[in-house]
Amino acid sequence: MGNCWGAKISSESPCRSASSPSGGTSKYASNSSVSAASVPPTPRSEDEILEAANVKAFAFNELRTATRNFRPDSVLGEGGFGSVFKGWIDEKTLAPTKPGTGMVIAVKKLNQEGHQGHREWLAEVNYLGQLSHPYLVRLVGYCVEDEQRLLVYEFMPRGSLENHLFRRSTHFQPLSWNLRMKIALGAAKGLAFLHSDKVKVIYRDFKTSNVLLDANYDAKLSDFGLAKDGPTGDKSHVSTRVMGTYGYAAPEYLATGHLTTKSDVYSFGVVLLEMLSGRRALDKNRPTGEHNLVEWARPYLMSKRRIFRILDARLGGQYSLAKAQKAATLALQCISVEAKNRPNMEQVVAVLEQLQDSKETGANPQLQKKSSSKNAGSNGSKPSSKGKPANARLV
């Protein structure tokens, strides 16, 4: 749950035309629960939090006990929202328990000085409090008491996809090809569910730090603070202030403020490209001309003979070239400049299902040994270890 956000940047955009999202009934809505045909608008105050939300309203003292008084050594991560703490509660009663007993939780505590505010906290409660799906992180509860605003989630022991792709440490081994495709499929199913006719939600901030992994490396989407209800009736898009993260936001959304499900598809394409290449969406530590992953990779993606040049050297060649070409082609389609040329998420899921390996997937320890000699291989210089470049939020 240690999602990290960078500095927010104001951006207002003029309105022009935007491509309409694809329709159709989604099979991914069938194994999930949602309160109505569409999620109600984000409440403006805690008094408007829907009583139907299937989450617990915690007292602040309960969460203080569960996290051992928010001790520094229980911090899982920090971000624009605030800090995330590890805690323990009883699985049935949800009452705080002793460390190491009961259910592990992640408690996100709003920083009153932070740039992510109360409205995003409300949006998170509103969406995750009503939506239930295998590929969405579970919101256990929330706390609103005086000035305190907290969110309580299921604990995701493998952390974020971002850490596994970009953090260099013995704790994070290079992800195998099969495991990357498994994670991509899970995340795609989560987005397909959100875009379904039953839900009609645009995620708006799909990126590696918002894809969390459970013990089995199953992907779950987190952080719904920027989520938006999709267009209704005969409307083709939602007009909104430009928000999200540089490097992941679709070009037409940046230019017009028009938001569609195809905006999420573009963001997914960027993340898939990060998974294929082992490079960040934006990295100013790279050589000139390679700062923007999409711009750098697009020419290689357009040629099957050159696709191998973008593939992560840490994969150690342990993949089928035919499957790599298919995944690269899918990424290219998702990052199409024209939204109408992008597939919908159900189509993305269908392609990714073809790329799954029936064998057990997992991190390959041997890849870590090979990476030291191959990091300067097919996809260029060794990934930067100068620290994480800040992903700037668009607000």
UniProtKB/Swiss-Prot annotation:
What reaction does this enzyme carry out catalytically?
Answer: L-seryl-[protein] + ATP = O-phospho-L-seryl-[protein] + ADP + H(+); L-threonyl-[protein] + ATP = O-phospho-L-threonyl-[protein] + ADP + H(+)
User: What GO biological process term is on the record, naming one?
Assistant: innate immune response
Q: Where is this region: Disordered?
A: 1-45, 359-395
Q: How does it assemble?
A: Interacts with CERK1.
Active site residues according to the UniProt entry: 205 (proton acceptor)
Supply the source organism for this entry.
Answer: Oryza sativa subsp. japonica (Rice)
Q: Describe the task this protein carries out.
A: Functions downstream of CERK1 in the microbial peptidoglycans (PGNs) and fungal chitin signaling pathways that mediate innate immunity. Participates in the activation of defense genes during response to PGN and chitin.
Give any GO molecular function from the UniProt entry: protein serine/threonine kinase activity
Instruction: State the InterPro entries in the record.
Output: Kinase-like_dom_sf, Plant_Ser_Thr_Prot_Kinase, Prot_kinase_dom, Protein_kinase_ATP_BS, Ser-Thr/Tyr_kinase_cat_dom, Ser/Thr_kinase_AS
Top enzyme class of this protein?
A: transferase
Q: What is this protein called?
A: Receptor-like cytoplasmic kinase 176
Biased composition (Low complexity) is annotated at 10-22, 29-39, 369-395
Q: Where does ATP bind?
A: 76-84, 108
UniProt lists the family membership as follows:
Belongs to the protein kinase superfamily. Ser/Thr protein kinase family.
* Residues of the Protein kinase domain: 70-355
What is this enzyme's EC? 2.7.11.1
Q: Which UniProt keywords apply?
A: ATP-binding, Immunity, Innate immunity, Kinase, Nucleotide-binding, Plant defense, Serine/threonine-protein kinase, Transferase
